[in-house]
Each structure stands twice: as C-alpha cells, then as structure tokens.
C-alpha cells in the first residue's frame, strides 16, 4: 500500500493495515 514511510507503522495505520 502506498503510505509514506513515517506513517507506515504509525499505530493508527497499523489498526487498518495489520
């Protein structure tokens, strides 16, 4: 998925992308 690196493993994104 095309998420910028600083946000890729942000907790809020991990909720959706794990």
Curated annotation (Swiss-Prot):
GO terms for cellular component: extracellular region. The keyword Disulfide bond does not apply. The keyword Zinc does not apply. One of its GO terms (molecular function) is oxygen carrier activity. Keywords: Iron, Metal-binding, Oxygen transport, Secreted, Transport. It is found in: Secreted. Disulfide bonds: none annotated. Belongs to the hemerythrin family. Major yolk protein. This iron protein may play a role in the detoxification of free iron after a blood meal. This is Ovohemerythrin. The lineage of its organism: Eukaryota, Metazoa, Spiralia, Lophotrochozoa, Annelida.
